[in-house]
């Protein structure tokens, strides 16, 4: 046996050193400090002292087992148990038990037998049935017995059953080992029963403890059971080893309540939904809906919020916020550093504006020495044309905008992308509505104006009248002390055209127009269309940089690579500098007129930015529709009847024309008839347009386009009619007629005759009969009537009889006498008037 110090023994037995020294002294082992060692002889003496403190008690128990019938079997069980006496306590605070110390010493020596218990169990079994009964009996005894004493046990204390059987002699017989294991099993069963009863029935435990003390037995308690050392293995009667027996545990959920709320920093982007905002603040979506409701906003968890509303919600709930910069990618891609480049003078961009048929395109045609007007339907410019003209004093880029009312937005775009505006006013017509509008656009864009008084060659031309009318609209000529140059021109004879160009170039010198000729190109989309065999085609005005074939470009929500470029004469070019209009091919789709064009080096970034812009447009459209729902509800409140809707599918040749027609048609909507353009696009009418028209009962309108063969066949089958136009006035007039057809006819009353009562007769069959003279119009038998007394209507009904002398009459004309019987009315008096009227339908007009 290895030597051990007093300190090590005290540490392994979980006892204080002073208490252990006193206990060793009581056993006759003198030690003075914790560094003193214990010899094997002293350890053996210590064990003998512990064993001598134990007593052996014998107990016999006889039980009776019933068999079938009247037979009984007596079962006698003898138990021997060693019970250790309590050692005298040296200190009141220290609990010293021989069993504890014995277990501790066993852990040190590991080969000394501390506890020797032998239970002689004699069982008398006469037959196999008695053995089975005994097994059932022992199983019932092993179960804990809980009486209904008003207490509820949620869990038993965890009891570790450990092995306390050790071998003292290597030659111990196998039968003795088996007996020890069975004895350990019995001790555990009784201990569990005692522990359960101790917890459930406190009073019964005390009474049983007294009885057990009288017979020399000591009752086990939970504290003693918890102090058993080693692993006690449980075996059944046949020696089969069982698993470790443990009392069930009760799982407890540990939760620490937060002391204060967590303040989060929420990143808010435009169009954030309620559910996304709730997730970032770690709250339920219903809480945010509740906050919105308190703010007077009805919302769902999937509804998008603007940034201002989201900020209010975050601050209301006690969190911080940061705004997400959604334009970071756009700023990084579209902003071009041109600090290393030098500016050069560029050609002026001139827009020709004015009223319809005042000669804008004719003037430009004379300047370009071409016949552009011949190619326009009806002599009216349908979309913007961009042309570059070279003169002796420099180049000028012209933009020709439509003049009639439908193309307001196109004129506004032309004014934004131009340097100088040539305002064409016909000398024989004066200032017209589109002339005033052109002046407003030019002033809003802060663009200088040069007035061209056209058609000066006509005899009825009056330029002084034009000057006077423009002066009233704050366009003051230089001759009157203003800053606007007036030039009399004739697009037919060419008179004054050279002076006009000189005035434009002079104005451009004053403006000192400059641009960067190098670097990535920037510009604006003047016009766009979809051409068969070429795909999307965009007319672009380059404003800065150098646009080259093969560049990656981004136009609004469309992107692509420049596959080909053509100038205003239709010739292919490889590069285009500032103030140069070009047609480009290669875009992914048709961009909107007015979109900015920018060259991006990385095609992947261009695609990503285009997708981001498209998503923004969709979100903005959804938000706008959501905001209009409530206003539409209030606008429709109190209106009688259902609003008729004229659905239209519009296809055009160019983007600008489609946009202008769309705006003009939407303006035709009234409270009774609404124009709904369910689809619009560029290019020929296809079979998908026909299918959509059938599904939505819409009218298909083509402006300068036609239907393809597949669409025509499908239209014949489904009965869809196409309407083709090349003049916008005709299109608008036909749509007005179609809207008038949807209007419900108006019912109007028309008085057709008046009869004056001269005398009243009594009839047994008809009651009161009025003898009348028809003084106006004609009285008809089948028409409704009104009875007037002193020009006040006192009755309205129908005629029951109308007679001329004794014969029935269907009508009586003016100047003839007749007898009139009013149905369900007998209070007819002399001097009354009987008014006959009819209800007619009158078609409504817009």
Swiss-Prot record:
Family annotation (SUPFAM superfamilies): Initiation factor IF2/eIF5b, domain 3, P-loop containing nucleoside triphosphate hydrolases, Putative DNA-binding domain, Translation proteins
Residues binding GTP: 354-361, 400-404, 454-457
Pfam families cross-referenced by the UniProt entry: EF-G_D2 (PF22042), GTP_EFTU (PF00009), IF-2 (PF11987), IF2_N (PF04760)
Localization per record: Cytoplasm
GO cellular component: cytosol
NCBIfam families: IF-2, small_GTP
Family: Belongs to the TRAFAC class translation factor GTPase superfamily. Classic translation factor GTPase family. IF-2 subfamily.
Name of the protein: Translation initiation factor IF-2
Gene behind this protein: infB
């Amino acid at each position: 046996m290895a030597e051990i110090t007093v300190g090590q023994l005290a540490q392994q037995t979980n006892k204080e050193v002073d208490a252990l020294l006193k206990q060793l002294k009581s056993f006759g082992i003198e030690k003075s400090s914790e560094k003193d060692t214990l010899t094997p002889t002293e350890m053996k003496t210590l064990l003998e002292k512990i064993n001598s403190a134990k007593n052996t008690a014998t107990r016999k128990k006889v039980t009776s087992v019933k068999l079938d019938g009247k037979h009984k079997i007596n079962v006698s069980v003898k138990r021997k148990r060693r019970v250790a006496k309590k050692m005298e306590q040296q200190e009141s605070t220290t609990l010293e038990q021989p069993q504890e110390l014995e277990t501790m010493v066993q852990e040190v020596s590991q080969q000394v037998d501390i506890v020797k218990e032998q239970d002689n169990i004699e069982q008398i079994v006469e037959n196999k049935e008695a053995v089975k009964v005994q097994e059932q009996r022992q199983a019932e005894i092993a179960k804990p017995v809980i009486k209904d004493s008003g207490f509820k046990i949620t869990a038993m204390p965890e009891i570790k059953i450990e092995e306390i059987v050790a071998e003292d002699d290597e030659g111990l017989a196998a039968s003795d080992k088996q007996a020890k294991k069975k004895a350990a099993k019995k001790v555990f069963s009784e201990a569990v029963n005692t522990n359960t009863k101790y917890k459930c029935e406190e009073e019964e435990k005390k009474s049983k403890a007294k009885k057990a003390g009288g017979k020399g037995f000591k009752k086990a308690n939970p504290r003693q059971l918890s102090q058993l050392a080693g692993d006690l293995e449980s075996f059944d009667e046949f020696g089969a080893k069982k698993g470790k027996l443990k009392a069930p545990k009760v799982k407890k959920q540990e939760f620490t309540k937060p002391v204060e709320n967590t303040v989060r920093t929420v990143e808010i982007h435009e169009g954030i939904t309620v559910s996304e905002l709730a997730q970032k603040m770690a709250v339920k979506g219903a809480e945010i809906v509740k906050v919105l409701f308190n703010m007077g906003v009805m919302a769902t968890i999937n509804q998008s919020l603007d940034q201002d509303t989201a900020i209010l919600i975050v601050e209301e709930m006690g969190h911080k916020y940061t705004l997400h910069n959604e334009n970071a990618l756009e700023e990084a891609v579209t902003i071009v550093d041109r600090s290393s480049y030098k500016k050069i003078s560029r050609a002026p961009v001139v827009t020709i504006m004015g009223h319809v048929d005042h000669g804008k395109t004719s003037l430009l045609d004379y300047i370009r020495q071409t016949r552009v007007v011949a190619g326009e339907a009806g002599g009216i410019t349908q979309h913007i044309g961009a042309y570059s003209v070279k003169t002796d004093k420099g180049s000028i880029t012209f933009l020709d905008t439509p003049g009639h009312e439908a193309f307001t937005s196109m004129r506004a775009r032309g004014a934004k992308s131009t340097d100088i505006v040539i305002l064409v006013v016909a000398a024989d017509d004066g200032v017209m509505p589109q002339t005033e509008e052109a002046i407003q656009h030019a002033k809003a864009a802060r663009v200088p104006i040069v007035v061209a008084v056209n058609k000066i060659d006509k005899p009825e031309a009056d330029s002084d009248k034009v000057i006077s009318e423009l002066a009233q609209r704050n366009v003051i000529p230089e001759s009157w002390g203003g800053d606007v140059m007036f030039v009399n021109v004739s697009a037919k004879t060419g008179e004054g055209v050279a002076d006009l160009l000189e005035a434009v170039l002079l104005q451009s010198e004053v403006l000192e127009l400059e641009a960067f000729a190098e670097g990535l190109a920037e510009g604006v989309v003047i016009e766009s269309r979809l051409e068969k065999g070429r795909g999307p085609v965009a007319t672009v005005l380059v404003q800065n940089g150098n646009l080259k074939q093969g560049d990656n470009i981004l136009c609004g929500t469309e992107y692509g690579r420049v596959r080909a470029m053509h100038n205003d004469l239709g010739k292919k070019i490889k590069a285009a500098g500032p103030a140069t209009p070009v047609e480009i091919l290669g875009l992914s789709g048709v961009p909107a007129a007015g979109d900015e064009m920018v060259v991006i080096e990385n095609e992947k970034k261009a695609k990503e930015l285009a997708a981001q812009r498209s998503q923004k447009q969709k979100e903005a459209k959804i938000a706008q529709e959501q905001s209009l729902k409530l206003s539409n509800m209030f606008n429709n409140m109190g209106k009688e009847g259902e609003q008729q809707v004229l659905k239209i599918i519009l296809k055009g040749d160019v983007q600008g024309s489609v946009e202008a027609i769309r705006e003009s048609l939407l303006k035709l909507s009234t409270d009774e008839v609404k124009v709904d353009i369910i689809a619009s696009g560029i290019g020929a009418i296809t079979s998908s347009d026909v299918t959509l028209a059938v599904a939505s009962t819409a009218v298909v309108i083509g402006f300068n386009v036609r239907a393809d063969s597949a669409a025509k066949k499908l239209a014949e089958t489904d009965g869809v009619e196409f309407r083709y136009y090349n003049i916008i006035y005709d299109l608008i007039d036909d749509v007005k007629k179609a809207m008038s057809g949807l209007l419900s006819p108006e019912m109007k009353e028309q008085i057709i005759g008046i009869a004056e009562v001269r005398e009243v007769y009594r009839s047994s069959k008809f009651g009161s009969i009025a003898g009348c003279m028809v003084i106006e119009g004609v009285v008809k038998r089948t028409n409704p009537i009104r009875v007037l007394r002193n020009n006040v209507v006192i009755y309205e009904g129908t005629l029951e009889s109308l007679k001329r002398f004794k014969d029935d009459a269907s009508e009586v004309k003016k100047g003839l006498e007749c007898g009139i019987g009013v149905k369900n009315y007998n209070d007819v008096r002399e001097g009354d008037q009987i008014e006959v009227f009819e209800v007619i339908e009158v078609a409504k007009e817009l």
